[in-house]
Amino acid sequence: MNPLTKVKLINELNEREVQLGVAEKVSWHSEYKDSAWIFLGGLPYELTEGDIICVFSQYGEIVNINLVRDKKTGKSKGFCFLCYEDQRSTVLAVDNFNGIKIKGRTIRVDHVANYRAPQESEDVDDVTRELQEKGCGAKTPPSSPPEVSEDEDAKVTKKPKKDKKEKKKKKEKEKTERPVQAELPSCSRSKTVKETDEQSAKKHSSKPSERAQKSECRERKKSHSGSPDGRTSCRGRAEEPEWEAKKEKHKHEHKPSSRREGEEKSRDKDRGRSSGTHSSRHHGHSEGRSHRSRSRSRSRSPDRSHRHKKHRYSHERESFHASDRRHY
């Protein structure tokens, strides 16, 4: 069969599998799963082993190569065999490199089921023998883990023990810190409870004192209902703090009223003296004048304080009694 027809057939198989979505297990590549060798045909004669490795190493690490040459001349015959490190790289190489052109020539890439190494001959060089025996791949380290000495094993085993001890210590510290934190809010709560109890006790103690003051005021009001002294004394005891605060406010307001009261008192004194010298007929007129002066003083100073009213009331009584005595 012509090599170009083989290239076309391989490409058609790959296209059908892609269209149908065939799994890897059922694919035609699975027939060569035990072989990591591929065949390369139609290569240019100028290519060397290094050139071939550069092109085909795109899809995997190349382990071995066998470029077939003429025994007499040593020239390439245009085909070779490649071995990949991973068998799956052969599938990628066949699918992607089959049918490509290198230096104007289409190459063919296909799987190799059973590769046989060439027979040894006397004309073969030492370099080719080493390649055939050892291959051209780089030496990779073994996949198994390196052996560890007994001392290193002991160190590795000691570390987790220390970690466990540290974890236990941390847990113990956390346990000791938690009850301390729980005690702190309890102390603060007890303080707040004590403060509330003290406030409530003060309130209860102030209430009976206020009630006692109110009851005393009521009794004094009943006994001294006619006298203004009783009212003032009761109010003074119950409203001492309020009265002291109002005193300072009304000082400036009562300055002009105090002057007027002084003038009126002097007038009342003069009138009382004159009433003693006159006869009994003029006694009624003096009383009328005194009543008028009272009404005038009340209308002029409506904002007088309780003390001034009390003083005025006592002074008028004295003047009235003095006039009566002189008359008799």
Swiss-Prot record:
Entry's Gene Ontology molecular function annotations: RNA binding
Sequence ranges of Basic residues compositional bias: 157-172, 291-314
Compositionally biased tracts (Basic and acidic residues): 192-219, 236-247, 255-273, 315-328
Pfam family, one: RRM_1
InterPro entries assigned to the protein according to its UniProt record, in alphabetical order: Nucleotide-bd_a/b_plait_sf (IPR012677), RBD_domain_sf (IPR035979), RNA_proc/Spliceosome_comp (IPR051847), RRM_dom (IPR000504), RRM_Ist3-like (IPR045844)
GO cellular component: nucleus; precatalytic spliceosome; U2 snRNP; U2-type precatalytic spliceosome
Record bears the keyword Phosphoprotein: yes
Annotated spans, Disordered: 118-328
Family: Belongs to the IST3 family.
Protein name per UniProt: RNA-binding motif protein, X-linked 2
Species this protein is from: Rattus norvegicus
Lineage: Eukaryota, Metazoa, Chordata, Craniata, Vertebrata
